[in-house]
Design a protein with these regions (language model features):
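Structural boundary micro-motifs
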Residues: 1-89
């Protein structure tokens, strides 16, 4: 599937990828699941899981592909951390 990656101001590139696609940086993991959306998992001091445009998964040089297993481990650990924090309140 060819996907056009855009930021809010400029064209970035057109990629030919198979969905789902998994990418990561030092504190973010991404699951690209459609032509324009991805799930972003933030690990670390302020863990979060959110929906965002796929340009987030391609905007910096230090972001690279990762395995589904790596993404799922980060997703489940982050979800557990978020739920544990809410339970403590």
């Amino acid at each position: 599937m060819k996907i056009e990656i855009k930021s809010t101001k400029e064209f970035i590139e057109i990629l030919d990828i198979q969905l789902p696609k998994f990418r990561k940086s030092s504190v973010f993991y991404y699951k690209i699941f459609s032509e324009d959306k991805c799930v972003m998992v933030e690990i670390g001091a302020t863990p979060s899981i959110s929906l965002c445009p796929i340009s987030r998964a391609y905007y910096a040089d230090y972001i690279h592909d990762c395995s589904e297993a790596d993404y799922m481990a980060a997703y489940h650990d982050t979800l557990k951390t978020i739920l544990d924090e809410k339970h403590e309140l």
